[in-house]
Amino acid sequence: MLSCRFQCALVLLSLAVVFSKVSAAPSDLRLRQLLQRSLAAAAGKQELTKYSLAELLSELAQSENDALDSSDLSRGADQDEVRLELDRSANSSPLAARERKAGCKNFFWKTFTSC
């Protein structure tokens, strides 16, 4: 009798183990699917991050180019004004070259001599 009860308990225990493994198999599959989905989502986020980074860099480069273009235009206008002022100062000499003193035309090492 004792052996019969022991055999029945052993059979019930083995059946419980088999059913637990069978019921655990789909959860492993579910876990694998969940893991694959999360990895795919992470890869999608990484691609999105790369896209966002590329988009950000292109916008930054575009704004930098726009700023450089506008500063080039303002520099060009400033240079035109400077050239105009230099032309005025060169043309507005009150005395002709003959009327200047001889010492004022001579220069030594980038400086004019005293007149």
From Swiss-Prot:
Record propeptide residues: 25-88
Disulfide bonds: C104-C115
Broad class of the protein's primary localization: secreted
Signal peptide region: 1-24
Function summary: Somatostatin inhibits the release of somatotropin.
Keyword annotations from UniProtKB, A to Z: Cleavage on pair of basic residues, Disulfide bond, Hormone, Secreted, Signal
Residue span of region Disordered: 65-95
Cellular component annotations (GO), alphabetically ordered: extracellular space
Pfam families cross-referenced by the UniProt entry: Somatostatin
InterPro entries in the cross-refs: Somatostatin, Somatostatin/Cortistatin_C
Basic and acidic residues bias spans: 75-88
Molecular function in Gene Ontology: hormone activity
Name used for this protein in its record: Somatostatin-1
Transmembrane segments: none
Compartments it resides in: Secreted
Recorded family membership: Belongs to the somatostatin family.
GO BP annotations listed: regulation of cell migration
PANTHER family reported for this sequence: SOMATOSTATIN
